[in-house]
């Protein structure tokens, strides 16, 4: 299935025009036209030997599941798994064996291809967005070391920008620059909405889930994720309310 393919495989399909109808269904007509054009242009660009740029997607922007010998078992985000009620497998710590399998491609792939056209050696960096930001920054630094890359740049969207900032602060000698795109450095209300079961994405997932409603998903899954707790808004965004103190939340089953 296309949603299980990695970015290099999708780029090859976009360049060649193969499986056009399926890709259009996945990316939308406008998305397919834009990405196929960018893929062909990037193929002509000389980006080998250019400065390495790691592209980090935002919150919920990486696929989560388990790796298989032939096919990965994708939980986030596979509509069949959602309908079967398997999103509850994402809850922590019970779902600790799950890992990031790749990046949700539409926006991240556009950024990667645009950077390649500009001459950069752009690489997508998937991460398990359920985890703490500090842990994810450490994993990013470990990947950079494993890749043997000297002085890369980081470009992070949303939560990815926060991970990039923390990685830069942890090892300024290793990273040349970090660029943030809409990063919630003072926190965000999105985690609040997710943990209350009213975030639009949670509502859409609940509409597909045949076994759980939005409050179930918030209670069982989203309030167990360290990343959402760490990205809660600072008090200066909440008129002084300290959302890091559970007593400030409604006294119900969804209280963190």
Model-identified regions with their sequence ranges:
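N-terminal non-catalytic accessory region
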Residues: 1-215, 222
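Glycine-rich, aromatic-lined ligand/substrate-binding cores of catalytic
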Residues: 220-256
